[in-house]
């Protein structure tokens, strides 16, 4: 009996060690996004993997083939001859983080997409293409990325220009449309080759893309002359030559790590605009009451404010600028909130409070569930000067909760 008890204790210790080891290798943000995040998975030990990973030569092949396809689309020279030119097609770059997660999926030896949240990263949502083939040969075959990318591209012959805008997703063309989604500009890929039986080799190719494409009711690209609709912080064509940047003639080349600026909104008539960027206005000036754990996170193409609270903690972010309009105003807060570890309860209490002298504050309790920023608009039919408070609290004994704020904006007049 004593021997059985000792064996049981050893197994418990081993289990705890393995769990703690996995957690230590799984970044906190990935554990927030999904309890099944692909990066946090280990290799499939039942799979007889013989080769894995993507060489530098294969990286170059992947990037070059994607950009050739995108450039042909942008110039109106695609092989199908049916698609119009694109004015905002970005040039693709390699992304190591996307590649690491793609490799982890390939290591599972299963020809199946992972879930959207399972591959999410902080910078953006992530799209995905996969391809597999089985080869009979005595010698271990080399990876041949040309076949995978050609297979995805050939879906163009089932795609028509009617679906460019508004875009409608279709499983028959989803690989192609992700390849040429104009706002996607980062790609990272993974590869494995494993032996199913003697002299039978299965190759699995995975590419992850960011920002993700295939968004229904959006647009595949802006139909226009090449380079005409490039976002800020990019160059294209002859403009790239002036910047001494090599680029494809029809592709918008991102100039630096800040990424392209997709926001085309004119904020000149707004009475309050805080997006937490370094060049943002004085509207972002604030002070903190309660737990001062707020951080400003710089990511590609964006910035956001974030806080993580434990059970029993609370915080108030008080903005010092007044909002006032004789016609009232429409206040929009873009946020996301939830448990800091996926799968635990979403119990954080988030309030947007508007204060004015001599009156009871207006209070709006907001909630969300998911990893996407949610813009929430509130019509305020008052012409008094008002101050914004962002209040967040977590009940005692509850698991840690997070709140992210992307922007806070107000324009004159009530919301549409």
From Swiss-Prot:
Residue span, SCP domain: 57-217
UniProt keyword list: Allergen, Amidation, Disulfide bond, Secreted, Signal
Protein name per its UniProtKB record: Venom allergen 5
Residue numbers of Arginine amide PTMs: 82
Note: The primary structure of this cryptide Pep-4 is identical to that of cryptide Pep-4 from Tityus obscursus (AC P0DRE9).
Gene source species: Tityus serrulatus (Brazilian scorpion)
Signal peptide stretch: 1-24
Post-translational modification: Contains 9 disulfide bonds.
GO CC annotations on file: extracellular region
InterPro entries registered for this protein in UniProt: Allrgn_V5/Tpx1_CS (IPR018244), CAP_dom (IPR014044), CAP_sf (IPR035940), CRISP-related (IPR001283), V5_allergen-like (IPR002413)
The keyword Disulfide bond belongs to this UniProt entry's keyword annotation: yes
Keyword RNA-binding attached: no
Family in the record: Belongs to the CRISP family. Venom allergen 5-like subfamily.
Annotated compartments: Secreted
Tissue specificity: Expressed by the venom gland.
Superkingdom in the source lineage: Eukaryota
